[in-house]
Amino acid sequence: MCTLNEKSKLDVAIDGADDVDTNLALVKGGGGALLREKMVEVMADKFICIVDESKLCKGLGPGFPLPVEITPFCHEHTVRVLENLPSIKGSCKAVLRMGSSSTN
């Protein structure tokens, strides 16, 4: 095992997803490690996502809340911007789920 700081590239990254639609678009990061997962995937030449049929859906969104990881810097502004996006204004509310704790 090694850390990502020790490698500049990975051959393959393997992970799961929270939701997968019929176009193979994914919702990931529901467990709270969105940024960490993305960093690993970006460093990999190949990304393999393994899911079972319980993760399949007709469209992303209704079955699983969209995870958005926000860093502490300028977090209040970021939440305001997200809450006021025209496509979701009034239909969603940002919920602080994990506070400032570190996960995974």
Where do the protein language model's features map onto the residues?
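Conserved phosphate- and dinucleotide-binding cores of soluble alpha/beta proteins
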Residues: 1-104
